[in-house]
Amino acid sequence: MSKNIVMLGLPGVGKGTNADIMVEDFKLPHISTGDIFRSAMANHTELGDKAKSFMDAGNLVPDEITNGIVNERLNEADVKDAGGFILDGYPRNTSQADSLESFLRSIQQKLNAVIYLDASEKTVTNRMLGRGREDDTPEVVAHRIDVAKKETMPLVEYYRNKGSLYTIDANGEVSVVYPKIKKLVSNL
């Protein structure tokens, strides 16, 4: 059976960090929209330049651009060969969630788990300011958290209502949080 997983949570909550460990344990590709966009920006692609203008202002990249990139990535051979994926940073709203569900249905797949890493704003703010990314200024961090709460939090209810949401307290260190994730994914 596939292990198709979405990681949800505020920016800086540890989605990417925990997903990277899951890659080692479960041999699933980690698909991070943030990494895709940062790579495109570094290479000054057309998409990268468009994404940069949104990200520099702390805003989300428009759905139509993001949906297309994610669908292309989910269709690549390594994802098909692995029998699953870990999505980090997508979907960010119910429109993207509907697009993902529709795409997965078109390839006879479905989501197996949506893991919501729940942490306080103080925790995620401190983590983001401590990671040293160019776009992590105090003002941009505060704005990103506000945007993410408005856009992402309805997803928590969306997936809770579908019965696929698993909430994990992510206020602690990775050494405390990750074993809970590993146990959950092992039982899928």
UniProtKB/Swiss-Prot annotation:
Biological-process GO terms, alphabetical: AMP salvage
Tagged with keyword Kinase: yes
EC number of this enzyme: 2.7.4.3
Spans annotated as LID: 130-136
Reaction(s) catalysed by this chain's protein: AMP + ATP = 2 ADP
Compartment(s): Cytoplasm
Keyword line: ATP-binding, Cytoplasm, Kinase, Nucleotide biosynthesis, Nucleotide-binding, Transferase
Binding site for AMP: T33, R38, N59, L60, V61, G89, Y90, P91, R92, Q96, R133, R144
Protein origin, superkingdom: Bacteria
Region described as NMP: spans on this chain: 32-61
Family in the record: Belongs to the adenylate kinase family.
HAMAP family: Adenylate_kinase_Adk (MF_00235)
Entry function: Catalyzes the reversible transfer of the terminal phosphate group between ATP and AMP. Plays an important role in cellular energy homeostasis and in adenine nucleotide metabolism.
Subunit relationships: Monomer.
Protein name as it appears in the record: Adenylate kinase
Species of the source: Oenococcus oeni (strain ATCC BAA-331 / PSU-1)
Organism ancestry: Bacteria, Bacillati, Bacillota, Bacilli, Lactobacillales
